[in-house]
Amino acid sequence: MPELPEVETVKRGLSKLIIHKKITTATSDNFKSFPNLPEEIEAFLLGARIISVRRRAKVIIIDLDTNYSLVVHLKMTGQLVYRGEENWGAGHPNDSLIGDLPDKTTHAKLEFSDGSKLFFNDQRKFGWMKLLATPLVEKLPFFQKVGPEPLTEQFTTEVLTQRLQRRSKSRIKAALLDQTTVAGLGNIYVDESLFLSQIHPETLVGDLTSEQLERLTGNIKQVLQQSIDAGGSSSRNYVDADGNRGNYLDGAYVYGRAGLPCRLCGTPIEKLKVAGRGTHICPICQPAPATTNQPTAKSTSITPKTHHKRG
């Protein structure tokens, strides 16, 4: 599933193409993928202009001048593909990104007044697109539960500490994967952030020091921003319509590098299973806690490797 940087990349790509466009037709072949009644679509979608594209957690929100919004969750295999003055798309890498559309994976289509089109494709039909009154978007159960946005100024060490309090007996990796703790974090960026923070993923939340939490807050922000600058990182299951893959993983610290030398100390990276997920660590830079009450942490600081932006 795409994580925050991949969805942010989609948001930025869409913003350049569809803002100010007028929607003239909207079709869907699957009510689960686009669960709105025809009368809702006719009243609030047809004839509407797009005024903004934004992101909350892993969800895209397309705001309309009718005070309604299209809320889009790509889930595992979703795609958004634009065909018009230029072709663009992002999502699960199959032929639908570059082939003729609509095809058998297309479950919704928007057509604009200039003849351009936006297709919502989803091979496994887990993703969805919903039309809602804009004031109701933040009241969706998903948004009511999701944690704070990590790239905002409001996301501080104090906020992270408060969000983790109810998970004091959980392993830190499990707590960070919980979307009610922090929005948009997934397996890749949790592993990377914990490595930079010198925290073993099996450390209990209640055993973390204030210094560790401060480092973790900053490194979550840093890793996510580096990945956005690199165009994302889900190279196996997330590409754009030109076949470009986010290149964050080319310079990843630990994720996907089992058996390779740590970029800092040279020790082979190990792969464990924590919280039911494959987990990558350096056993020297991230020593396992001696006991659940006394986690071990090195005192030396880490100077992160610079990730290169996509050229």
What are these regions (language model features)?
Residues 45, 143-146, 199, 238:
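Short clusters of hydrophobic/aromatic residues that line enzyme substrate/ligand-binding pockets
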Residues 40-44, 65-67, 86, 137-138, ...:
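Short, glycine- and charge-enriched coil/turn segments that flank and shape catalytic ligand pockets
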Residues 66, 76, 114, 124, ...:
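A broadly conserved detector of short glycine/acidic/proline-rich loop/turn motifs that flank catalytic sites
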Residues 1-4, 100, 150, 154, ...:
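Generic detection of long, well-ordered alpha-helical segments
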Residues 70-184, 189-196, 204:
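Phosphate/anion-contacting hairpin/loop surfaces
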Residues 22-41, 54, 88, 159-311:
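Basic, nucleic-acid-binding surfaces and adjacent catalytic neighborhoods in DNA/RNA-processing proteins
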Residues 56-58, 104-106, 142, 258, ...:
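A generic structural signal for well-ordered coil/turn residues at beta-strand boundaries
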Residues 1-129, 302, 307-311:
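Gly/Gly-Pro- and Ser/Thr-rich, intrinsically disordered tail segments characteristic of DNA damage-repair
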